Amino acid sequence: MGSCDRKALWALSFLLLLLGSSSVQGTWEAMLPVRLAEKSQAEEVAATGSRQPHADRCPPPPRTLPPGACQATRCQSDSECPRHRRCCYNGCAYACLEAVPPPPVLDWLVQPKPRWLGGNGWLLDGPEEVLQAEACSTTEDGAEPLLCPSGYECHILQPGDAAQGIPNHGRCVKQRRQAEGRVLRQKLHKEYPEGDSKYVAEPGKGQQRHFP
């Protein structure tokens, strides 16, 4: 093969190579806008995904179609609604409705502690059963006795000695119903095991009742 034929073959190969590269580049340039459009659409969906209607803040769907429900202004996400409204289903379409407040959360750190009544029974009591730092006395020595506030009774811890002028001393505990007296006595005996008996004063009275 002569040198002219070789040059012609090289020129033809180079021309085909240029045509192929330009075709590939043209195809990529033609596909680039489509790729960018798909990417931007995916980013938009990801960005608006968190603004979709929150079903947990929506009122339950009505059983009957409310008047004007189908004529209400429609929405697609909560961001299209005012502050206190959510994009919810109104029975016909999604529209901005009043948001439902979240359910209450029980904080068991501050909730009343359960009290065992025996068997399978439990009773929720107040946050504090003993009035903190509240001393009391039922001894009448010419002055008014140091009684407890309403709803509490004086649980005598130290009987005192009336002959020597020593008043009794106790703490204010919350009153119980008569049916709970046995449980209360057992609990107080565990908390204050001074001796085999306890003295509990009636509220507003000077005398004491002795529980064996």
Curated annotation (Swiss-Prot):
InterPro entries: Elafin-like_sf, WAP_dom, WFDC1. One of its GO terms (cellular component) is extracellular space. Keywords: Disulfide bond, Protease inhibitor, Secreted, Serine protease inhibitor, Signal. It comes from Rattus norvegicus (Rat). One of its GO terms (biological process) is response to xenobiotic stimulus. SUPFAM superfamilies: Elafin-like. This is WAP four-disulfide core domain protein 1. It holds the Pfam family WAP. It comes from the Eukaryota.
